[in-house]
Amino acid sequence: MKRDSDMKKTGSTSDFLPTRNRELLQTLRRLIMTTEGVPLGGLYAMAAQSPCSRFWVSEKRAAEVISRMMRGEDTDVKSLPLRNKMYRELLRRVQEWQAQNPGRPLTDAVFAAVNSPAPEFYVTPESAKVIISRIMQRKRR
């Protein structure tokens, strides 16, 4: 049985896996069609670092982490470099949104930030390869 500390947080990326995974696969396919001379491993890295339609985390989870960051509290994402990078970018966008919309609730700022285009998928090239390989295996069955 999993301990609470081993389980994913409610509202984490896992709520969006099918949509994120489809978008990642589409990105890889586009790169395959438009990029010459790059080995497949390089294409996985390029796909992982490509812009995507949104940040793949729920507004609820993002609000929890960003709120703690704004209060200077320790977050549980510091040991995960890409997660940390993603939340730092979300925090930057939230603060920018709040400066332009004073008096509005944090939840509005987080909603706007999470649902804005993200600069990358925030997954490692190795994770991108595993994600896409699993999708392709399911399609073959």
Where do the language-model regions lie?
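Short, charged amphipathic recognition helices of the HTH superfamily
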Residues: 32-51, 97-117
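Basic, amphipathic alpha-helix used for nucleic-acid engagement in HTH/winged-helix/SANT-Myb modules
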Residues: 1-33, 45, 50-99, 140-141
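A general marker of short, structured functional hotspots
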Residues: 12, 40, 83, 117-118
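Secondary-structure junction/capping motif
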Residues: 39, 58, 74-77, 81, ...
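Short, basic interhelical loop/turn and adjoining N-cap
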Residues: 48-65, 112-134
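Short, leucine/isoleucine-rich alpha-helical interaction segments at C-terminal helix-coil junctions
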Residues: 135-139
